[in-house]
Amino acid sequence: MDFNLFMQDVVDAARKDITEAGYQELKTEEDVDQALNREGTTLVMVNSTCGCAGGVARPAATNSIHFDKRPDHLVTVFAGQDREATDKARTYFEGFPPSSPSFALLKDGKILTMIERHDIEGFSAMEVTEKLQTLFDQHCEEI
């Protein structure tokens, strides 16, 4: 099997996982500016093809939103795939180095906090879900 075809299947599956969970995919700089400057809270899932993204981060992204409090907006950028959109999103994450997979929580276009790769790798999907839900409890409104 051609490696590029295999990797495209992996990328397509990773995109599908997160968009089927209800996250809006941002593919351009304009998409990012429009989405991240909205009023309210926004969770950005920085997706990737690594094992901890598929085994931990994406399941946590899916499970965490079934909670009394959650962000107003759910969006995703794909590191290594949609580079311009990812780079643009990272300009909003002031004070945090590039990290993927990761989660950024913003309010009214300003970064509140992040769950970085080192907060994901080596943890279970349930542990990362709990980290996200703790942030939602602190910063989000009840739905």
From Swiss-Prot:
Stretch forming the signal peptide: none
BP-aspect Gene Ontology terms: cell redox homeostasis
Xref: Pfam families: Disulph_isomer (PF06491)
Family according to the record: Belongs to the bacilliredoxin family.
Name listed for the protein in its UniProt record: Bacilliredoxin OB1863
Record organism: Oceanobacillus iheyensis (strain DSM 14371 / CIP 107618 / JCM 11309 / KCTC 3954 / HTE831)
